[in-house]
């Protein structure tokens, strides 16, 4: 026999919260109390009584009425809240908050009387758009720079460079130095955690170490020893080192210089699967242009999404923002871990707190973008068919088989494909129903302004000269 329908009142609150008032009949309260007492009498162990056979009066004497009532109330709250959600069709985003707090309710709880529960919870917001078509977005036109081909080739040259020993001069910028060092803080002489190393290679380029270190090694000769005075940046990742001055006892053990390979067909074969420099350059140019086109498309999408978000009306609950913040911080930690950084030592409670605070703006922006697209899909009835999903799924699964990838979550893969296909349709709709104005890059705009300014100056000078010319 199912429980009688609960008497429930609901009212909307700001930021997608809902207030719920539930009237719990006295008989439900009494039943919950009796169940709690029976459960405790079966589990409690009291000398002189067999387990499970302790009289209820003895249980009450041993545990006290309040403890039994607390157990009864806790169980009652869980059951009543679950029933309320099901009865009212509420989909909460977080655990409910009791208006008066558990302790206050317990203090006034009488199993013989009706209980009035007042709770609040966050619910999924319903986003709406004031407007979704006829909007104008501005986007900077990305112009392909052929110099990037040369930059990539130079990077490959550096990677394929051979290290040649240097013995007849002091260390210079760009050299590779083999050094040993031991660091300590200047203020108290304490050893710096991770501030010592034996015989490691360091490229003498700015930004490789903390300020003052590279500059100090430059000018040293092999077998020289030197004390370098440095200072940790104020935003350094180790909390105890931030902004502190330090001394490093450094010895230069060896010195080498990079010898770059010649730019010929042999280099092209080493650096790629191409047979000659001409083919290598053509391939790099093609890849860079494709990358430029992808970035341009992404920039267009971002600008369209920005103007759409301005038309969004939605109240985002705090619990959703907090959840998104946690995701951002976790992704940040994963990125550092993939770079080989010890996340446990780096992510101190202070840093995590700071990251969570600074990520709130980004979290809210991401959520507003999601809700804007969700509202667009609903208002324009844009959806993805099963046929489209299955067709794309077959393509992706074929690619996965070719790459020998394992441990693929089929459900998540299908969800990701569905999301991607829906986004493609949404942005295609935005492109078709709105205007994107392409403007020249900032550099080009500055050059145009400069030319325009020069023309005006030249014209003014000519006019001045003309006015000074005597009449005939």
UniProtKB/Swiss-Prot annotation:
Region Disordered: start-end pairs: 433-472
InterPro entries cross-referenced by the UniProt entry: PPIase_dom_sf, PPIase_FKBP_dom, Trig_fac, Trigger_fac_C, Trigger_fac_C_sf, Trigger_fac_ribosome-bd_bac, Trigger_fac_ribosome-bd_sf, Trigger_fact/SurA_dom_sf
Ranges where the PPIase FKBP-type domain occurs: 174-261
Basic and acidic residues bias spans: 439-451
Superkingdom: Bacteria
Any one GO biological process: cell division
Entry keyword set: Cell cycle, Cell division, Chaperone, Cytoplasm, Isomerase, Rotamase
Enzyme Commission number(s): 5.2.1.8
Keyword ATP-binding: no
Subcellular location: Cytoplasm
GO terms of molecular function: peptidyl-prolyl cis-trans isomerase activity; protein folding chaperone; ribosome binding
Record field: catalytic activity: [protein]-peptidylproline (omega=180) = [protein]-peptidylproline (omega=0)
GO cellular component: cytoplasm
PROSITE patterns: FKBP_PPIASE
Cited HAMAP family: Trigger_factor_Tig (MF_00303)
Protein purpose: Involved in protein export. Acts as a chaperone by maintaining the newly synthesized protein in an open conformation. Functions as a peptidyl-prolyl cis-trans isomerase.
Free-text comment on this protein's domains from its UniProt entry: Consists of 3 domains; the N-terminus binds the ribosome, the middle domain has PPIase activity, while the C-terminus has intrinsic chaperone activity on its own.
Family to which the UniProt record says this protein belongs: Belongs to the FKBP-type PPIase family. Tig subfamily.
Protein name (Swiss-Prot/TrEMBL): Trigger factor
Gene source species: Prochlorococcus marinus (strain NATL1A)
Organism ancestry: Bacteria, Bacillati, Cyanobacteriota, Cyanophyceae, Synechococcales
């Amino acid at each position: 026999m199912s429980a009688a329908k609960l008497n429930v009142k609901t009212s909307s609150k700001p930021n997608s919260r809902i207030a719920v008032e539930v009237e719990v009949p006295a008989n439900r309260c009494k039943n919950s109390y009796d169940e709690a007492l029976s459960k405790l009498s079966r589990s409690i162990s009291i000398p002189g009584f067999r387990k499970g056979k302790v009289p209820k009066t003895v249980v009450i004497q041993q545990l006290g009425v309040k403890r039994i009532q607390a157990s009864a109330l806790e169980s009652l709250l869980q059951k009543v809240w679950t029933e309320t959600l099901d009865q009212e069709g509420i989909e909460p985003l977080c655990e409910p908050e009791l208006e008066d707090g558990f302790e206050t309710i317990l203090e006034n709880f009488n199993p013989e009387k009706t209980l009035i529960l007042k709770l609040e919870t966050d619910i999924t917001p319903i986003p709406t758009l004031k407007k979704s078509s006829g909007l104008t977005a501005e986007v900077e036109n990305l112009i392909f720079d052929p110099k990037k081909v040369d930059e990539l080739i130079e990077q490959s040259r550096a990677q394929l460079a051979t290290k040649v020993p240097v013995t007849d001069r002091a260390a210079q910028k760009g050299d590779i130095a083999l050094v040993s060092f031991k660091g300590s803080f200047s203020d108290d002489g304490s050893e710096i955690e991770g501030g010592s190393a034996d015989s490691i290679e360091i490229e003498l380029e700015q930004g490789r170490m903390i300020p003052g270190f590279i500059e100090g090694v430059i000018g040293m000769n092999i077998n020289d020893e030197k004390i370098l005075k440095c200072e940790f940046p104020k935003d350094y990742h180790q909390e105890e080192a931030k902004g502190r001055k330090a001394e490093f006892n450094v010895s230069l053990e060896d010195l080498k210089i990079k010898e770059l390979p010649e730019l010929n067909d042999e280099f092209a074969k080493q650096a790629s699967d191409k047979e000659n420099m001409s083919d290598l350059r053509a391939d790099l140019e093609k890849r860079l242009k494709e990358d430029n086109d992808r970035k341009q498309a992404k920039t267009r999408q971002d600008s369209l999404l920005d103007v759409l978000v301005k038309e969004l009306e939605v109240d985002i609950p705090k619990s959703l923002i907090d959840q998104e913040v946690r995701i951002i911080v976790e992704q940040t930690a994963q990125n550092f871990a993939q770079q080989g950084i010890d996340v446990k030592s780096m992510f101190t409670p202070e840093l995590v707190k700071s990251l969570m605070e600074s990520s709130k703006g980004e979290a809210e922006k991401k959520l507003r973008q999601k809700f804007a697209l969700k509202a667009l899909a609903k208002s324009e009835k844009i959806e993805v068919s099963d046929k489209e999903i299955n067709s794309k799924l077959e393509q992706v699964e074929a690619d996965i088989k070719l790459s020998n990838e394992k441990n693929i979550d089929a459900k998540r893969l299908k969800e990701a494909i569905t999301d991607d296909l829906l986004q493609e349709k949404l942005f295609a709709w935005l492109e078709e129903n709105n205007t994107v104005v392409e403007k020249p890059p900032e550099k080009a705009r500055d050059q145009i302004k400069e030319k325009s300014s020069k023309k005006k100056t030249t014209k003014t000078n000519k006019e001045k000269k003309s006015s000074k010319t005597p009449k005939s």
